[in-house]
């Protein structure tokens, strides 16, 4: 399975709420590759405008935007948060108070989209405040088959609501925002994609664009599982799973700035009793070079696509993840982490 959020707000309705900005150097690399308007100078002011940062916002900058950015006070961190913090300090990693500041790396608190203890999704931040507008209609339970073209001009979409029949809705503009999985699927069913693959599925080719659905990427994570001593186990519905993280630059395999992150997990899901016996600490590659693809299996929009992640396919990704696991293992041997656990395992192997 490749889990996605099927709701207004998409995957922001089910994700970890973590609100980490992209690294400025990465945006500049996009601009250098030809993505006009995506340099750090272009993008960072937009982050400033959409955020309402409870800790670092100032009038006119990172304050008053539709999406709250909040950090758990350290005195309320979980046991694994505190253990990772203290172990990282003991190992000599620097502290980075504001993870979203453009420069630096190190130990930080995860910023999250939260207000008054409640998740704030893109639906909450953008759509709900506009719900009462006379010129806005919101319709859910919709399945988009394809975009409708007149010649090479977009004029609408073919869509089904609930169990009804497919219908065509026309409009001056179509904004395609179905996520990393279904946006390319809609394009391919619309005839935009690899001509040979589309023809094999009986889809009329509008534009031969082999890159559609290709170059898929995601961040691999490997976790050390912590069997926590009873007094360090997370308890209660409000026990947040993660607050503490550690970013660093591997300087391996051509990786970019701040390409790696180590994340504390106070629990891996609460048990029915409300007490979680296990926590974890994960290391993740945030600048992956491996590429996969999203591929249609049918022209039928009810049929799910195949998602080939190809994680760790690139040798530089394997190099950096091996280094990351070694770093994580060293942190786990330090007393702040070792002292709160009964056992530490990587998969089926003991530390």
Each language-model region and where it sits:
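N-terminal glycine-rich phosphate/pyrophosphate-binding loop and immediately adjacent elements
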Residues: 1-48, 204-212, 217-228
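Cytochrome P450 core scaffold surrounding the K-helix E-X-X-R motif
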Residues: 24-31, 149, 292-294, 304-307
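Flavin (FAD/FMN) cofactor-binding core of flavoprotein oxidoreductases
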Residues: 219, 289, 332-351
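Glycine-rich loop(s) and the adjacent beta-strand/alpha-helix scaffold that form part
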Residues: 46, 147, 156-238, 299
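General small-molecule cofactor/ligand-binding pocket signal
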Residues: 96, 137-139, 204-208, 263
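Flavin-binding catalytic cores
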Residues: 204-206, 314-340
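FAD cofactor-binding and catalytic pocket of flavoenzymes
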Residues: 221-326
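Conserved redox-cofactor binding core of oxidoreductases
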Residues: 31-154, 160, 223-227, 235-236, ...
């Amino acid at each position: 399975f490749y889990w996605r959020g099927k709701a207004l707000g998409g995957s922001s309705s089910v994700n970890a709420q973590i609100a980490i900005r992209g690294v400025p150097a990465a945006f500049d690399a996009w601009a250098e590759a030809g993505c006009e308007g995506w340099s750090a100078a272009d993008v960072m002011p937009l982050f400033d405008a959409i955020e309402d940062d409870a800790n670092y916002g100032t009038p006119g900058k990172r304050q008053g935007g539709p999406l709250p950015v909040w950090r758990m006070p350290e005195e309320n961190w979980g046991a694994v948060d505190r253990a990772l913090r203290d172990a990282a300090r003991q190992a000599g990693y620097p502290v980075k108070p504001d993870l979203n500041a453009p420069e630096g790396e190190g130990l930080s608190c995860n910023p999250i989209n939260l207000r008054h203890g409640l998740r704030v999704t893109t639906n909450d931040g953008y759509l709900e405040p506009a719900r009462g507008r006379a010129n806005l209609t919101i319709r859910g339970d919709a399945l988009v088959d394809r975009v409708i073209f007149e010649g090479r001009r977009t004029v609408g979409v073919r869509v089904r609501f609930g169990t009804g029949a497919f219908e065509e809705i026309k409009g001056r503009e179509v904004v395609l925002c179905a996520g990393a999985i279904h946006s390319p699927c809609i394009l391919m069913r619309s005839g935009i994609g690899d001509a040979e693959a589309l023809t094999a599925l009986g889809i009329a080719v509008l534009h031969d664009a082999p890159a559609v659905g290709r170059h898929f990427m995601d961040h691999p994570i490997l976790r050390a599982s912590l069997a926590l001593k009873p007094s360090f186990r997370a308890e209660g519905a409000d026990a947040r799973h993660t607050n503490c993280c550690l970013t660093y630059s591997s300087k391996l395999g051509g990786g970019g700035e701040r390409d790696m992150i180590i994340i504390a997990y106070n629990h891996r899901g609460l048990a029915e009793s409300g007490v979680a016996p296990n926590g974890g600490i994960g290391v993740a590659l945030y600048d992956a070079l491996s590429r996969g693809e999203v591929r249609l299996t049918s022209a039928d929009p009810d049929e799910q696509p195949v998602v080939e992640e190809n994680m760790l396919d690139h040798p530089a990704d394997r190099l950096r993840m091996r280094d990351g696991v070694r770093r994580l293992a060293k942190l786990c041997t330090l007393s702040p982490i070792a002292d709160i656990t009964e056992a530490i395992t990587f998969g089926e192997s003991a530390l």
